[in-house]
C-alpha cells in the first residue's frame, strides 16, 4: 500500500508535468522476468581462458616463497600471474580523488594481510583446470600475529597490519581520525539533567547480489582491450585499471550497464585489472568471476562499526550535547573506507539540532577482508546506533519517542555540526505522517510543529 | 511459550551524492533523422530503473513522450563520463546533466521548427504528442519528425545537446570537520511492529509502516519498488545477515545462502508507505536520492520494537534469536538491570567456543 501526502509542502510543487511523476514500466523488467536479459557472463568468446586465484589461508603471514612449477604442468593450465607481472602492483582505488597512500597489492608478494587475499592467478582452458592449477601452487608462509578488534588494533604494540600506513589507522590531514567539533560538549553535559553513554556494534554484511562480481576481457584489434564488466562505475574501473597496468587510457574500453545487483559491492576494482593483464599477456579472452564463496568471504563487505554515543539531555527533552566515538573496521586495506569514515562523521549527530557535538571517527586496519562501499555507506550503522540511543533517551526522560524526535529534529536554517545550514528539512513531517499511518498518537503541540517553523 | 508484541520507531535522513571527491556526470543527446532522441551516457543501471527515469527526465524537458527517448549507456567508447552509480547520486546527478543537455537540444529543435513555420522560435512550444506548435494558435504546428528531417537534410543542423552536472569537491576542515559532504537530504520515519517468541528468541516482524520524503517521486511505482526493497534489506540487516557471525572472531563465516541467512517470503511483514514530496531546489524536478536511505530506518525501528516487546536491548547487529534469548534470560535473573547484550570479549571467546 502506498499513499501520497500531498497536504505537506503543497505550495512547493509545480504542476503541469506529464512525463515525470507518472509510472512507466521499467525498461528492463520484461527481460529480467523472462530470463532474457544479457549479462556480461552471457557473452561467449572462442578461446576463453578462466582465471582462478590462489588465496591466503592465513589472516596475516609473511610469504617465504611461491612455487608455481607444478601448477604449470597441470593439463589445460596456460600460464600463471604473480606480483612480478603487474606493472604497478601497489594501488588504492581512491587515488583517483587523491586519497593516499597506495596501500594494496593487486597480487600479494611479501605478506598477506587477510584470509583470502589473492596471490597467484592461474589461467586455464577450463574452470576445472584452473582450480586444479590453483591447488598445485605451493606458497610457503611464516604466520604473523593478527589483530581483529578495532580498539585492540589502536593500542601500542598491536601487530602492524599495513606497512604502507605505518600504523593501524588512516591519517586525516595529520589527525588520527576524522573529527567534527561544534560548540562545547563539556558545557552541554554539565547543563544536562541526564548523561548516558552506550556502545553499539555491527558485524560485516555481504551485498549478496544475485550475480557475483566478475568480468570478461577481450583483446580487440589495434592493441585495444574491451572489458565486459558488471561494475557500478565504468570510469572508476577504466582509470584504475590503466594506472595499475601502466597502460595508455585509450587502450582500454569498459562495456557494462546491466548488473544483477550492486548495492555498493561492485564499486571496488578487483577483477578487472588482473583480467586485463591476463588478456594482454596471453592475447586471449579472459574471464574472472567470483564464486559465491569468494563473493561472501573475499569481496569487500559492509564495514563492521563500533560506536560509542554519549548524550546529555535535559528534562524537557532537549539534547544538549552528543559525543560520538566511531570505529570503522576497514580490514586490511583502505579501498573506500577512508571516504566512508568521513561520511559517517558528516552524518553525526543525525538529523537533530544539537548545540554541542564532538565526533571522532576512526578508520582502523585489521587482519580481515577489506570492507568497502555498501548501500548506506557510513550512515546505515550510524543510524542504527543513533536511533536506538534516541529510544533510550526518550524512555529515560519519560517522553514519547515520536514527540522526542520531533522536538529535536532539525529545521530549515539550523546549523549542522559540520557547519552547513539546514535546507529542505522534512523530518518533522515524516514523523507526523508515520504517526498517522501507524495510529501512534502524538500531542497537538507536536502535530503543529513543522520543518519550516520550530513551533506551530 | 509466550509471544510478546512490541512497537518501535526510528527517523533518519540521507545525503544525496558524494562530493568529498568532486561529483560530476555527463550526458549527450541527439535527435535521429526521424525525431527520436538518443541520450548517451556511461552510467550503469543496477536494476533500480535508472534508464527509465532518465528517459522520463529527458522527455519532460524536451516536451516529447518517454517512448521517443532511447537511453544508450555504459560503453566508455561512446558515453561521456559518469562518476558511477552509488551514493544515491544517479537520479540527481545524471538527471541534472540530462536536463542541461535536453535544454540545449530543445533550443535547436525550436530554431529549426521556427524556420520551417516562418515564426519566431520564442513563440513555439512542444505539445507532448510529437508536434511543435505556435503558442496560442495550435493549428499552426509541425511534427517533430518533419523538424528532424528538415534539420538533417535541409538546414544542416544537429539537434543535439551537451549536459554536465558537477558538484564541486568539498575539502573537510581538519580541525572542525566543517564541510559540504552532499547536496540535498531525503528523510524517512519507520514504525515497526514485532512479535518475539520468549522461548526461542525468534523475532517476527509483523509490519513496517513508513513515511518517506523523496523530494519528488519521478516514477511512483519505481519509488515504491525502491522503498519496499530497501525495507526488506533493512529487516534482513536487523535480524539475519553477517559474514562474521562471531565478529570480531573470524570463524564460522558463511560461504553460501544455506549459511548466510536472509528473510524468505514467509518472513516478510506487511508494508505500508506514505510518500511526502518537498522538492529539492537543486534536484531534477525536485527529486532527491532515496536508494540507500530506504534500508536504514527499519533497522533501529525493529530493535526498538524488540525492546518494547520483551524489555531487551540488543545493541549489536544482527539481532539473532541467541542474543534475544540471552537478554531475556539475563532480565529474568535481574529485572532491574538494563544490559546491552553485546560484550566483545564474550562474543570472541564464549560464543565461538560453544559452536
Where are these regions (language model features)?
Chain B
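C-terminal catalytic domains of large/alpha subunits in multi-subunit enzymes
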Residues: 1-14, 56-331
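Short, aliphatic-rich beta-strand segments
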Residues: 36-41, 205-207
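Conserved strand-to-helix beginnings and helix N-cap segments that scaffold or border functional pockets
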Residues: 51-52
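Short linear segments in intrinsically disordered or otherwise low-structure-confidence regions
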Residues: 334, 347-348
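Short, intrinsically disordered C-terminal tails of secreted or membrane-associated proteins
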Residues: 351-354
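Conserved beta-alpha junction segments in alpha/beta enzyme cores
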Residues: 8-33, 41, 48, 184
Amino acid at each position: 500500500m502506498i499513499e501520497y501526502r500531498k497536504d505537506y509542502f503543497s505550495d512547493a510543487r509545480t504542476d503541469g508535468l506529464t512525463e515525470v511523476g507518472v509510472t512507466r514500466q521499467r525498461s528492463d523488467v520484461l527481460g529480467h522476468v523472462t530470463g532474457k536479459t544479457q549479462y556480461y557472463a552471457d557473452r561467449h568468446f572462442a578461446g576463453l581462458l578462466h582465471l582462478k586465484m590462489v588465496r591466503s589461508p592465513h589472516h596475516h603471514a609473511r610469504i617465504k616463497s611461491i612455487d608455481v612449477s607444478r601448477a604449470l604442468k597441470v593439463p589445460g593450465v596456460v600460464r600463471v600471474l604473480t606480483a612480478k607481472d603487474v606493472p604497478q602492483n601497489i594501488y588504492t582505488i581512491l587515488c583517483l580523488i587523491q586519497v593516499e597512500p597506495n596501500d594494496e597489492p593487486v597480487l600479494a608478494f611479501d605478506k598477506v594481510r587477510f584470509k583470502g587475499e589473492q596471490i597467484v592467478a592461474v589461467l586455464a582452458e577450463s574452470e576445472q583446470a584452473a582450480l586444479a592449477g590453483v591447488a598445485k601452487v605451493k606458497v610457503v608462509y611464516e604466520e604473523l600475529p593478527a589483530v581483529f578488534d578495532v580498539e585492540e588494533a589502536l593500542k601500542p604494540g598491536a601487530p602492524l597490519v599495513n606497512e604502507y600506513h605505518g600504523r593501524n589507522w588512516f591519517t586525516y590531514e595529520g589527525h588520527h581520525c576524522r573529527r567534527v567539533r561544534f560548540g562545547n560538549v563539556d558545557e552541554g553535559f554539565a547543563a544536562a539533567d541526564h548523561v548516558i553513554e552506550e556502545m553499539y556494534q555491527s558485524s560485516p554484511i555481504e551485498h549478496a547480489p544475485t550475480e557475483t562480481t566478475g568480468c570478461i576481457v577481450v583483446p580487440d584489434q589495434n592493441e585495444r582491450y574491451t572489458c565486459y564488466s558488471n561494475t557500478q562505475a565504468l570510469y572508476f574501473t577504466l582509470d584504475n585499471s590503466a594506472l595499475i597496468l601502466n597502460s595508455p587510457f585509450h587502450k582500454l574500453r569498459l562495456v557494462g550497464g546491466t548488473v544483477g545487483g550492486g548495492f555498493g559491492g561492485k564499486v571496488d576494482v578487483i577483477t578487472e585489472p588482473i583480467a586485463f593483464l591476463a588478456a594482454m599477456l596471453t592475447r586471449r579472452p579472459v574471464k574472472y568471476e567470483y564464486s559465491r564463496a569468494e563473493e561472501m568471504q573475499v569481496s569487500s563487505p559492509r564495514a563492521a562499526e563500533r560506536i560509542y554515543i554519549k548524550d546529555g539531555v535535559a528534562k524537557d527533552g532537549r539534547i544538549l550535547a552528543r559525543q560520538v566515538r566511531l570505529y570503522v573496521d576497514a580490514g586490511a586495506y583502505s579501498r573506500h573506507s577512508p571516504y566512508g569514515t568521513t561520511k559517517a562523521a558528516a552524518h553525526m549527530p543525525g538529523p537533530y539540532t544539537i548545540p554541542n557535538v564532538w565526533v571522532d571517527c576512526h578508520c582502523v586496519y585489521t587482519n580481515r577482508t577489506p570492507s568497502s562501499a555498501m548501500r548506506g555507506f557510513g550512515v546505515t550503522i550510524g543510524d542504527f546506533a543513533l536511533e536506538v540511543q534516541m529510544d533510550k533517551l526518550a524512555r529515560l526522560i519519560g517522553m514519547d519517542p515520536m514527540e522526542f524526535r520531533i522536538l529535536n529534529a532539525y529545521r530549515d536554517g539550523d546549523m549542522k555540526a559540520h557547519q552547513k545550514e539546514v535546507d529542505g528539512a522534512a523530518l518533522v513531517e515524516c514523523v507526523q505522517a508515520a504517526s498517522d499511518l501507524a495510529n501512534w498518537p502524538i500531542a497537538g503541540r507536536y502535530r503543529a510543529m513543522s520543518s519550516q517553523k520550530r513551533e506551530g | 511459550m509466550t509471544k510478546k508484541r512490541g512497537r518501535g520507531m526510528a527517523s533518519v535522513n540521507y545525503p544525496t551524492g558524494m562530493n568529498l571527491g568532486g561529483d560530476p556526470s555527463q550526458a549527450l543527446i541527439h535527435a535521429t533523422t526521424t525525431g527520436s532522441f538518443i541520450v548517451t551516457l556511461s552510467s550503469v543501471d543496477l536494476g533500480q530503473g535508472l534508464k527509465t527515469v532518465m528517459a522520463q527526465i529527458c522527455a519532460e524537458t524536451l516536451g516529447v513522450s518517454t517512448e521517443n527517448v532511447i537511453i544508450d549507456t555504459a560503453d566508455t567508447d561512446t558515453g561521456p563520463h559518469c562518476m558511477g552509480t552509488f551514493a544515491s547520486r544517479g537520479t540527481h546527478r545524471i538527471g541534472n546533466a540530462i536536463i542541461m543537455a535536453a535544454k540545449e537540444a530543445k533550443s535547436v529543435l525550436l530554431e529549426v521548427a521556427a524556420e520551417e513555420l516562418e515564426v519566431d522560435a520564442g513563440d513555439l512550444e512542444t505539445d507532448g504528442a510529437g508536434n511543435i506548435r505556435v503558442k496560442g494558435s495550435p493549428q499552426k504546428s509541425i511534427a517533430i519528425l518533419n523538424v528532424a528531417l528538415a534539420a538533417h537534410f535541409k538546414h544542416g543542423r544537429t539537434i543535439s545537446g551537451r549536459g554536465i552536472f558537477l558538484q564541486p569537491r568539498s575539502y573537510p576542515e581538519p580541525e572542525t570537520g566543517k564541510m559540504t559532504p552532499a547536496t540535498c537530504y531525503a528523510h524517512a520515519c519507520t514504525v515497526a511492529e514485532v512479535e518475539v517468541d520468549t522461548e526461542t528468541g525468534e523475532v517476527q516482524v509483523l509490519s513496517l509502516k513508513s513515511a518517506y520524503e523523496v523530494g519528488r517521486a519521478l516514477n511512483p511505482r519505481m519509488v515504491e519498488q525502491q522503498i519496499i526493497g530497501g525495507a526488506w534489506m533493512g529487516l534482513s540487516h536487523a535480524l539475519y545477515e553477517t559474514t562474521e557471525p562471531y565478529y570480531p572472531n573470524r570463524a564460522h563465516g558463511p560461504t553460501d545462502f544455506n549459511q548466510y541467512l536472509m528473510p524468505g517470503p514467509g518472513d516478510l511483514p506487511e508494508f505500508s508507505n506514505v510518500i511526502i514530496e518537498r522538492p529539492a531546489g537543486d534536484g531534477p524536478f525536485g527529486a532527491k536520492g532515496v536508494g540507500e536511505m530506504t534500508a536504514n530506518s527499519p533497522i533501529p525501528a525493529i530493535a526498538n520494537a524488540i525492546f518494547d516487546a520483551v524489555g531487551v536491548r540488543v545493541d549489536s547487529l544482527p539481532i539473532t534469536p541467541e542474543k534475544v534469548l540471552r537478554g531475556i534470560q539475563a532480565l529474568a535473573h535481574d529485572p532491574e538491570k538494563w544490559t546491552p547484550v553485546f560484550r566483545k570479549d564474550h562474543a570472541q571467546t564464549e560464543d565461538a567456543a560453544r559452536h
